[in-house]
């Protein structure tokens, strides 16, 4: 079972969205762009337990909290605004095909569209496949003063005209949808509350009825008072005083202590999952375990569920990387990709992002105030899949999540420019720090690769800034750089090291070299004379050789850290200042009165 189309209207922070998927989907984007809302919308539509809570939706489940449209004519009643979530499902299981047969339609495989009336010849294997369209509609009911939501079959041939048949809860269970809101806590996933992972497991194993009956029976037979003799006189005194106000005809004891209310619902809330992770450790409540252990335990439960329903599991999972080490992050991602029919994952981790192909990675962005759009990364032309995989963890993933990217051609610039930026930001409070602005630095490893990566980032909607060495280039080659860079900085030097040698004062260069000698560096290996030359030209030549060595990238950053404001390389400083103009500091109204006082 797979979701290939998803439409959302007036739900949470999304006024409208029409998304298309082909298998697994990694959802990336800035905070509050709508990643979690997509997962919540899927849960509203496919989750078997989501609509059974009361109320199923609330005021702020509506876009901007608007659940009533003001009347156009004075005196008329306002019109309820409707939440709509629609999905088209393919790869249906045999049981779904059987039980939902009259609601089936057909999906054209090659053209990726729904067959319409008059296309009966296309409804054949190889050309099209059966599909199922579902829709959840939620609205406010003024008459009852409550919010309602229901899921329907869009194709309902047997329904009364203008109406649709509802999707029952037992049918939704066949879809196998599981939504893990976050791995950051197992407090609900590892409880026995309705809809929790343990509850799902018990339902799949068909052991829930026996569990509750046997547990309630054993708890009834547990005599707490027998093991606590000091309770006897207290309970007797309570009964005597109670009889003074409420006559009781029951003979013998009228009060008794139990460890719970002896109901299923109360037991669901009170039963706890214990675990022990070491030989010297007694079992403790799972809440007392480390967060990383909890998250891994949740993954174990998910894998168990997937094994029980191998052909019909759709996972929606938020940020699986929370408090989990990198190798576990990769394992979680690999498991989802190989053991589920479809997985919807939100993540900011390069270790998770690198596991998804460009075809399965979607960058979410706002087109206007409430419209959400998703761009498939594979559609960002100019970057081969091998390049995507190679550079994914080396900065590509971070850049994709930002608003701008500085593309450089080597490790020296990659390490030095962030240091220079921090120095400028530390001295000028009017500058918006690049980290906060969402600007990353990406090492393309050579100037020839800058246009390729810039084109990729530009297609994703990022601002692109290039900083590279001078070189003999014809007009066509120069045009490639200019076409994809918002700031196209080809400086006049043959290398970043030459720029530092030319623009940083010689006194600072000499002091830096002396500092290296004093730190105990292997002077012979790096060809630094123990007595520095007095000639300025010799110092500049020496600094170029030293910074071009294997440790040169880190040393270039170290040199810039030691520079005073007037000693910094003008070319690099002016380049960064151009970038700051694209990301002005947000205006913050200063606090006044008592709130402005420091406690």
Per-segment meaning from a language model:
Residues 1-47, 273-398, 570, 581-599:
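Switch/communication elements of ASCE P-loop NTPase nucleotide-binding domains
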Residues 19-20, 30, 75-80, 125-129, ...:
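Conserved catalytic network of the ASCE P-loop NTPase/AAA+ motor domain
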Residues 24-27, 178, 405:
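Conserved beta-strand position immediately N-terminal to the Walker
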Residues 40-128:
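Conserved P-loop NTP-binding catalytic core
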Residues 81-85, 130-134, 173-177, 312, ...:
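Short glycine-/polar-rich loops that comprise or flank the Walker A/P-loop
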Residues 92-211:
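Electropositive, glycine-dotted interaction segments
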Residues 189-192, 199-297, 301-313, 476:
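Extended helical coiled-coil dimerization/tether regions that scaffold
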Residues 394-407, 411-599:
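Acidic, Mg2+-coordinating catalytic modules of nucleic-acid enzymes
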């Amino acid at each position: 079972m797979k979701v290939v189309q998803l439409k959302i209207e007036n739900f949470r922070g999304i006024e409208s969205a029409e998304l298309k998927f082909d298998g697994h989907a990694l959802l990336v984007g800035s905070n509050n762009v709508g990643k979690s809302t997509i997962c919540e919308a899927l849960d509203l539509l496919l989750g078997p337990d989501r609509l059974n809570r009361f109320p199923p939706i609330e005021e702020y489940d509506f876009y901007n909290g608007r659940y009533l449209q003001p009347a156009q004519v004075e005196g008329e009643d306002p019109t309820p605004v409707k939440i709509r979530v629609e999905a088209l499902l393919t790869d249906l299981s045999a049981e779904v095909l059987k039980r939902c047969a009259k609601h089936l339609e057909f999906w054209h495989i090659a053209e990726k569209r729904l067959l319409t009336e008059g296309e009966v010849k296309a409804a054949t294997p190889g050309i099209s496949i059966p599909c199922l369209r579902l829709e959840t509609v939620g609205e406010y009911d003024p008459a009852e003063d409550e919010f309602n939501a229901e899921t329907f079959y869009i194709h309902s041939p047997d329904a009364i005209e203008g109406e649709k048949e509802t999707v029952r809860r037992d049918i939704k269970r066949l879809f196998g949808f599981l939504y893990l809101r976050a791995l950051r806590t197992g407090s609900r996933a590892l409880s026995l509350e309705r809809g929790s992972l343990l509850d799902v497991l018990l339902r799949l194993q068909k052991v829930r009825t026996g569990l509750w009956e046997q547990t309630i029976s054993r708890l009834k037979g547990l005599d707490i008072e027998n093991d606590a003799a000091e309770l006897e006189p207290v309970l007797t005194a309570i009964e005597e005083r109670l009889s003074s106000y409420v006559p009781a005809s029951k003979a013998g004891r009228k009060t008794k202590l139990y460890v719970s209310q002896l109901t299923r619902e109360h037991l669901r809330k009170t039963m706890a999952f214990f675990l022990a992770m070491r030989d010297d450790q007694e079992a403790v409540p799972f809440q007392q375990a480390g967060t990383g252990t909890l998250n891994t335990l949740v993954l174990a439960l998910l894998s168990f569920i997937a094994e029980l329903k191998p052909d019909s599991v759709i996972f929606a999972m938020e940020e699986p990387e929370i408090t989990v080490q990198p190798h576990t992050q990769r394992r979680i991602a690999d498991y989802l990709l190989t053991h589920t029919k479809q997985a919807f994952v939100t993540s900011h981790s390069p270790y998770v992002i690198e596991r998804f192909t460009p075809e399965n990675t979607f960058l979410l962005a706002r087109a206007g105030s409430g419209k959400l759009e998703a761009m498939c990364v594979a559609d960002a032309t100019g970057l081969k899949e091998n390049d995507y995989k190679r550079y994914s963890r080396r900065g590509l993933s971070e850049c994709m999540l930002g608003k701008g990217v500085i593309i450089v051609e080597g490790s020296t610039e990659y390490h030095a420019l962030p240091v220079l930026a921090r120095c400028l930001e530390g001295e000028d409070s009017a500058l918006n720090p690049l980290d906060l602005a969402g600007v990353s630095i990406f090492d393309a490893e050579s100037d020839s690769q800058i246009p390729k990566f810039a084109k990729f980032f530009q297609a994703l909607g990022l601002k692109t800034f290039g900083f590279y060495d001078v070189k003999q280039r014809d007009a066509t080659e120069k045009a490639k750089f200019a076409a994809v860079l918002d700031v196209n900085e080809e400086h006049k030097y043959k290398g970043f090291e030459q720029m530092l040698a030319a623009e940083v004062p010689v006194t600072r260069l000499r002091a830096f070299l002396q500092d290296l000698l004093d730190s105990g560096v292997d002077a012979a290996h790096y060809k630094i004379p123990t007595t520095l030359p007095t000639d300025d030209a010799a110092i500049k030549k020496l600094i170029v050789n030293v910074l071009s060595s294997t440790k040169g990238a880190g040393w270039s950053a170290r040199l810039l850290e030691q520079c005073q404001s007037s000693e910094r390389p003008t070319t690099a400083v002016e380049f960064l200042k151009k970038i700051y103009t694209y990301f002005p500091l947000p205006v913050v109204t200063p606090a006044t009165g008592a709130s402005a006082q420091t406690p």
